């Protein structure tokens, strides 16, 4: 199958990011042009190191640029308590000499977009700091963005605070800017990613697939205590799945605002499902997932990975 969708992936690996990067690299429908890193699950130095380790593991020459070390206006609150101090605890990667590009992520994204023959798809599976910096410094790039597909937000409960999902809560100001930007946005939030559970039986079959399966199995063992007994939610992988199998998702056009001021609600995505605010829709929000179809797709895409 010929790759037809050219993408840029902005990520903060992170254990579940590793599975999403694998899918972005090896799904035959996708052509990954650039990876950029951002502070989120752990510091940007660690997310960059982790992404380079993964590229070395797969012997990939995809260029990688290091991005923002802190949110736009706030100190970083990471998720090392979930992913481990390094961000990818549980597997011993081979040493390498790879380095990121000399330019920061938002400039690297600009360069790829402006040199592309047609608009490209951005995929963001971490905080939206790099995307906001791109739009702040180079607003003309918006014309070269086909759409932004993001993992983040929620129409209901959060997973970082009672109301806020982690990726949005880390940098609410960046997310607010992005949702106000006029970009075509597909939001894969907790409403679908909490459904994207891989069963213990599926996880235990990973080592027999290939070396990537062995690596992911080791990482998932450290994702959360007991996760191999209860299953693992593949939050970030949902954004990649939508690119390849959009029919698995039920979307609704909604107005989405990001709360930046609330003492208890900062980082909340206000998803106006019923149109009560009278604002025009600015996002396609994924609200339901064909779970069986998602699991079948995951099994198929992992079979492409070496």
From Swiss-Prot:
Instruction: Give the EC number(s) listed in the UniProt record.
Output: 3.2.-.-
Database matches in Pfam families? IU_nuc_hydro (PF01156)
Identify the keywords attached in UniProt to this record, alphabetized: Glycosidase, Hydrolase
**Where do transmembrane segments lie in this chain?**
none
* Keyword Hydrolase attributed: yes
Q: What would be one Gene Ontology cellular-component term for the protein?
A: cytosol
Top enzyme class = hydrolase
GO molecular-function annotation terms? purine nucleosidase activity
Q: Which residues form the active site?
A: 235
Q: Which processes are annotated in GO (biological process)?
A: purine nucleobase metabolic process; purine nucleoside catabolic process; pyrimidine nucleobase metabolic process
User: Ribonucleoprotein among the record's keywords?
Assistant: no
Which protein family is it in? Belongs to the IUNH family. RihC subfamily.
* HAMAP family per UniProt: Nucleosid_hydro_RihC
Reported function: Hydrolyzes both purine and pyrimidine ribonucleosides with a broad-substrate specificity.
Which protein, by its recorded name, is this? Answer: Non-specific ribonucleoside hydrolase RihC
User: What is the originating organism of this protein?
Assistant: Salmonella typhi
């Amino acid at each position: 199958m010929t790759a037809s969708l050219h993408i840029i992936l902005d990520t903060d690996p992170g254990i579940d990011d590793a599975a999403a990067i694998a899918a972005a690299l090896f799904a035959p429908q996708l052509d990954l042009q650039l990876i950029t890193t951002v502070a989120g699950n752990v510091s940007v130095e660690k997310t960059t190191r982790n992404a380079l380790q993964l590229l070395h593991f797969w012997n990939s020459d995809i260029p990688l640029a290091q991005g923002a070390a802190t949110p736009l206006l706030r100190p970083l609150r990471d998720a090392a308590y979930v992913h481990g101090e390094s961000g990818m605890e549980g597997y011993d990667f081979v040493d390498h000499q790879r380095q990121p590009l000399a330019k920061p992520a938002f400039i690297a994204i600009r360069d790829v977009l402006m040199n592309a023959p047609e608009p490209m798809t951005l995929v963001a599976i971490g905080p939206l700091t790099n995307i906001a910096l791109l739009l702040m410094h180079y607003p003309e790039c918006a014309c070269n963005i086909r759409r932004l597909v993001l993992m983040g937000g929620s129409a209901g409960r959060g997973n970082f605070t009672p109301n806020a999902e982690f990726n949005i809560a880390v940098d609410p100001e960046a997310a607010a800017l992005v949702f106000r930007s006029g970009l075509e946005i597909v939001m894969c939030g907790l409403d679908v990613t909490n459904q994207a559970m891989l069963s213990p039986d599926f996880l235990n079959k990973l080592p027999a697939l290939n070396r990537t399966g062995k690596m992911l199995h080791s990482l998932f063992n450290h994702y959360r205590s007991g996760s191999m007994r209860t299953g693992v939610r593949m939050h970030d992988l949902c954004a990649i799945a939508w690119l390849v199998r959009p029919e698995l998702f039920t979307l609704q056009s909604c107005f989405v605002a990001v709360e930046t001021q609330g003492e208890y609600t900062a980082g909340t995505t206000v998803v106006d499902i019923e149109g009560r605010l009278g604002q025009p829709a600015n996002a396609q929000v994924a609200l339901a997932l064909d779970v069986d179809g998602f699991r079948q797709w995951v099994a198929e895409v992992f079979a492409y990975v070496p």
